[in-house]
Amino acid sequence: MDKHFEQNSELSRREFLKSTAAAGLALTAGVGGTSQSIAAAPAGDNPIRKENAKPGTRDWLLTKTDVTKNEPVELWRSPRIEGYCSATSVSAGDTIKIMVSTNPVSEFSLEIFRTGYYGGDGGRFMKRFDSLKGKTQSTPPVGKRRLRECTWEPSVELGIPKDWLSGVYLGKLTAKKGGVQSYVIFIVRDDRPCDLLFQCSDLTWLAYNSWPTNEYSLYHNDKNGYTGYKKRKKWSTDAADTGWVGFDRPYSQFCQDHLVKNPKSVGTGEFLLWEFPLSYWIEQQGYDVSYISNVDTHTDGPGLKRAKGFISVGHDEYWTREMYDNVSAARDAGVNLAFLSGNSVWGMVPLLPSAKGQFHRVMHRAGKFLGEELSKMLSKRKGWTSTFPAGPDGALLMGGAHRRN
């Protein structure tokens, strides 16, 4: 590809993203409630402006990855060094456990960065752990409904300092032997009033995570392999067509390599691919933003009402019924909603406990947010050969449809 064209394409994508984000925030409205206004150009200091005035760095970027290409056995995995966290989000003052495996066995380092704008660097260094003892931790057996749950020993227990601001945090793992790197990812949340709530789409990251092999996302089964796009296989809740997935495992590289290949995002789910650009822009503009997980939307409905606006970003496909109800209640209480992605509020899932009893760690398909009428109509079409429970209509929440009285 011509270098000049590459540069112009990058500029075009950046400008498109900025324009889309700005339009989305400007047009945000509380459907069905009394909306609160969000200043287009925030004035004065707020925690995000103060945070982004601190020195940034680009050291958060991975420089050497080794994502396995041995299809279909370990495609998209980073077996030389990989890890996961004990929670999707954590409050400042609490502790999060980070589980890491190295193969071959190697000492490793862990550097923690908060992502944001930071003068264009995209991240700020927060903490470093050196000379950590690595070990090769076992790949879990196939469990009920094809669930793969790791029970790795913690490598680090990180107490989140009280002064760490809400945000998306990356843990950069670097093996001493060979220097191979990958990420772990977690969210620091808070409960302060804010302009915007940025919801990370981590249930969808989980749905598309095929770790440990190219076979264990919601879109794989024993008979047909990847069912999402292979000859347009049916979308189904049947056990024969889809399995269960859990957070207790590393994130592999995003499995839809026909859309994007980015091995240097390995371990971050879909955050760096689809969500970080908007976070970068929001913090550049100085909006007072706080970050939450899909799991927080599921568990803490009242907490959504502390914001003027709620933003669904990235690939926000999989929701629980509790998420739908909580966001609807926030809207009715006057919180503005912005859905800045496609394929949102589509698949309905429950959140179940892990084998160890930790809440909200496992999910499976349970239905679609289509409403009864549309669900029945689509089930009769060619290719929609499976019936499944119909949740409420996602379009009603997103403003794509309205009920007539």
State where each predicted segment sits:
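An acidic, glycine-rich "communication" segment
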Residues: 347-405
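Structural beta-strand segments of beta-rich domains
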Residues: 94-98
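Extended acidic/polar, glycine-enriched regions
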Residues: 108, 148-193
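N-terminal secretory signal peptides
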Residues: 1-15, 29, 38
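C-terminal segment of N-terminal export signals and the immediately downstream linker at the start
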Residues: 9, 31-74
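Short beta-strand segments of immunoglobulin-like
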Residues: 85-90
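Helical hinge/lid and interdomain linker segments adjacent to catalytic or ligand-binding clefts
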Residues: 135-150, 157-159, 163-165, 267-353
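Aromatic-Pro/Gly-enriched surface loop or interdomain linker
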Residues: 105-132, 178-303
